[in-house]
């Protein structure tokens, strides 16, 4: 039997374990949350790499204050570098595929659902493939990357603008004054701009944790495109008036399986190294599992 562990910086309340036959292999699968403790995460990674055949790492953004993208990228690299004996994955490529798959499923099954919708991405850079997919259905898109990544009070309003920003974002701070961008008045103005953008959107693409600080006035009637939504969070979104949640993380083996954990399971079962699995391989596997994106109504 092969062992797979998914270590998440999310809550330990949602831990689980199960045995299953998967792609011709018998797997023992664990999900372990560390409650945003980097120290505990490192300890678990070092302990489990002596026993696991593959490890998935899920970084949950609750513990980051915006702007945070650079902090997240830095921490992900530090965590993956801890594991040297066995394959380790964040499931980023699979997450992109799952989100695109979910959006196309909704578009086809609910009758041109995203056609001409007003869509706000908290991060276009983190969801570039998804942005390209949604752009096939609507050009009414905006991206909050400058606002949330760099603290600059500006939204991007086209896919071309996002591509230009992605190519040159690292130069922006050369002329921006960090002290000014970090000042309380600028932070308040940025939050006002983000809330205004949410109010004008019909669809919000964001990590579910990043919506915790918004209320019914902001989210009433919205569709949220996200991943790995627990029942507790779904209930809270319902209290805030969210109309529908599109969740790319499939429900398999009686659990919601995060992309990082599912990718680790695939790696362990196939023996392929991270990055060597093709997009078509992932899609074929999802079809074999008879998995479906989750459309949830709070």
Question: For each of these PLM feature ranges, what is it?
Answer:
Residues 150-157, 233-240, 253-261:
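Short, charged, surface-exposed secondary-structure boundary motifs
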């Amino acid at each position: 039997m092969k062992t797979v562990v998914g270590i998440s910086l999310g809550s330990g309340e949602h831990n689980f374990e199960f045995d299953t036959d998967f792609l011709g292999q018998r797997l023992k699968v664990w999900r372990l949350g560390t409650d945003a403790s980097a120290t505990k995460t490192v300890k678990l990674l070092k302990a489990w790499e002596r026993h696991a055949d593959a490890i998935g790492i899920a970084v949950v953004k609750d513990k980051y204050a915006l702007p945070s993208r650079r902090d997240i990228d830095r921490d992900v690299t530090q965590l993956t570098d801890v594991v040297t004996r066995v394959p380790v994955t964040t499931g980023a490529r699979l997450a992109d595929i799952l989100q695109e798959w979910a959006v196309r499923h909704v578009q086809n099954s609910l009758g041109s659902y995203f056609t001409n919708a007003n869509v706000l991405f908290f991060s276009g850079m983190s969801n570039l493939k998804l942005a390209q997919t949604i752009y096939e259905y609507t050009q009414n898109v905006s991206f909050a990357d400058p606002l949330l990544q760099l603290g600059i009070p500006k939204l991007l309003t086209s896919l071309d603008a996002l591509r230009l920003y992605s190519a040159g974002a690292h130069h922006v701070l050369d002329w921006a004054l960090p002290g000014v961008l970090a000042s309380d008045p600028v932070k308040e103005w940025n939050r006002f701009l983000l809330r205004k953008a949410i109010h004008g959107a019909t669809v919000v693409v964001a990590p579910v944790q990043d919506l915790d600080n918004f209320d019914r006035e902001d989210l009433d009637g919205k569709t949220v495109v996200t991943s790995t939504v627990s029942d507790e969070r779904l209930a809270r979104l319902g209290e805030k008036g969210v109309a529908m949640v599109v969740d790319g993380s499939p429900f398999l083996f009686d659990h919601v399986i995060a992309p990082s954990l599912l990718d680790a399971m695939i790696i362990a079962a196939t023996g392929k190294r991270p990055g060597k699995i093709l997009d078509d391989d992932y899609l074929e596997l999802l079809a074999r599992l008879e998995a479906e994106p989750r459309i949830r109504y709070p």
